[in-house]
């Protein structure tokens, strides 16, 4: 939207007090305007309003909280639950306590059922003129809407409120809980900007909270939904990842695993700045092979991260140690992050933010997501998963990071099914399979896709013996290994000799 010729100077931007929301708004809110924060009860409107005012207090500004639905004591309880104090904040309440309703009360209080809207607003504006706050929050508009009794009168009073604040060097947040009539389109048209807070129920786990900036006149903002949480300390907003905003030119180089035969499968190593999918049935060795790359990166002095959906950190470390992969010292040194992720408690937006934080703070070179099955369970639908994963993989690839993702297929032998088709997003695919030989169930692996450069097309045996991971010679005597129903097609005597060697 273009500005009028006389408004050559851009508006001053002030922080909302919520870092993630400021990111969504490209800095914050335009000073001296009126904004609507809309959402159902319990979505975090009051908390956001308090954070907005406390940011003003921290900057030495005068601030005011107009409590239309809560008493000052209730507001102080909310602040205390987050470790805050309302000191330095003028709280103007219009809800009477029992003492204030008694004949002994020494001052007048206004109640929505007893006074007219004009009288109530006159009282508020008089207080504003005396205090001259630079930030003000109205909580909430439902009481004003009840006082108005009709939409026309209500709209006129809100317009008058807007004009008063615009001319008073004051930035105003109007909180609306939408308990009457759902979304107020008229109010949204009056406000300079609209922020919608939502809380979505799930069959299991915590509610998923998200926000959307519906409009912001004359200003850029990141469209779409952004996950957020409410914790002790306020709202924590996780802006939607847009990979196009993070384009960099990172050099390509081969990333080695520490096992020469595994590197040969990828034609000399996995390329940095690519995504590799480790695909196979449960227990086939996907997580252990991924741990090789994490350990190898840490040994080179590079940072790496593992986000585990399926195992506890204790189990992950114990299994890795049993295979000669000691990550403990690297975790203690801060080179490796091993984070257990609970999809029932963490939204995808928060998960992506955790990856971004580690990558940007530590300049990580390897990121492992173990597994995508856990991430799928955290998503409401497959379409959203593919879009989110596309942005995440693009972001990591642009930073020159090698990303490893494990995906467990259903079944162990024979035909297997994928929970979601995500292979087209991967630059390389390393497939794992079980096969039977000499009365034993063994494992095999092969690279079936690599976008950049050549790769070995052989199928090799994967062995976990002697406290280490070993990659065997190509399985030239078997056919149909990757189908899950192999057929021996080689020399029987060689097969028997290998069986004896394995027993030894």
Task: Enumerate the predicted regions with their spans.
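Short glycine-/polar-rich loops that comprise or flank the Walker A/P-loop
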Residues: 32, 59-62, 87-88, 169-170, ...
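Walker A/P-loop NTP-binding active-site region of P-loop NTPases
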Residues: 27-93, 265-327
């Amino acid at each position: 939207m273009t500005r009028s010729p006389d408004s050559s100077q851009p508006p001053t931007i002030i922080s909302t007090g919520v870092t993630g929301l400021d990111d969504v708004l490209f800095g914050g809110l335009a000073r001296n305007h009126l904004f609507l924060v809309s959402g159902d009860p319990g979505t975090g409107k009051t908390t956001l309003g308090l954070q907005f005012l406390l940011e003003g207090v921290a900057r030495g500004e005068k601030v005011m909280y107009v409590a239309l639905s809560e008493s000052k004591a209730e507001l102080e309880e909310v602040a205390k639950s987050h470790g805050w104090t309302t000191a330095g904040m003028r709280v103007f309440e219009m809800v009477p306590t029992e003492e204030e309703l008694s004949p002994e009360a020494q001052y007048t209080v206004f109640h929505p059922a007893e006074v007219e809207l004009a009288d109530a607003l006159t009282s508020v504006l008089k207080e504003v003129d005396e205090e001259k706050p630079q930030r003000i929050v109205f909580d909430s508009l439902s009481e004003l809407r009840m006082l108005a009794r009709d939409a026309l009168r209500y709209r006129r009073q809100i317009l008058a409120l807007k004009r008063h604040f615009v001319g008073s060097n004051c930035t105003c947040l109007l909180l609306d809980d939408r308990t009457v009539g759902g979304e107020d389109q008229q109010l949204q048209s009056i406000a300079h900007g609209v922020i919608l807070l939502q809380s979505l129920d799930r069959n299991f786990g915590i509610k998923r909270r998200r926000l959307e900036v519906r409009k912001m006149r004359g200003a850029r903002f990141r469209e779409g939904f952004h996950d957020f949480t409410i914790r002790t300390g306020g709202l924590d907003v996780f802006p939607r990842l847009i990979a196009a905003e993070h384009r960099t030119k990172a050099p390509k180089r081969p990333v080695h695993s520490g096992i020469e035969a595994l590197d040969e499968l990828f034609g000399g190593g996995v390329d940095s700045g690519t995504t590799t999918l480790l695909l196979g049935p449960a227990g086939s060795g996907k997580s252990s092979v991924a741990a090789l790359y994490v350990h190898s990166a840490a040994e080179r002095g590079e940072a790496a991260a593992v986000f585990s959906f399926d195992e506890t950190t204790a189990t992950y470390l114990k299994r890795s140690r049993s295979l000669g992969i000691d990550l403990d010292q690297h975790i203690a040194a801060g080179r490796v992050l091993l984070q257990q992720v609970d999809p029932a408690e963490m939204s995808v937006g928060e998960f992506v933010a955790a990856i971004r934080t580690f990558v940007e703070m530590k300049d990580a070179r390897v990121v492992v997501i173990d597994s995508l099955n856990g991430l799928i369970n955290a998503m409401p639908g497959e379409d959203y998963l593919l879009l989110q994963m596309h942005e995440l993989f693009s972001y990591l690839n642009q930073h020159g990071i090698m990303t490893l993702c494990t995906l467990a297929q259903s079944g162990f032998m024979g035909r297997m099914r994928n929970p979601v088709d995500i292979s087209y997003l991967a630059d390389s695919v390393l497939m794992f399979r079980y096969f039977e030989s000499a009365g034993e169930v063994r494992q095999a692996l092969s690279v079936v896709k690599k976008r950049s450069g050549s790769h070995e097309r052989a199928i090799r045996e994967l062995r976990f013996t002697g406290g280490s991971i070993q990659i065997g010679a190509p399985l030239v005597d078997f056919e149909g290994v990757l189908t899950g129903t192999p057929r021996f097609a080689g020399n029987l005597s060689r097969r028997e000799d290998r069986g004896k060697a394995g027993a030894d």
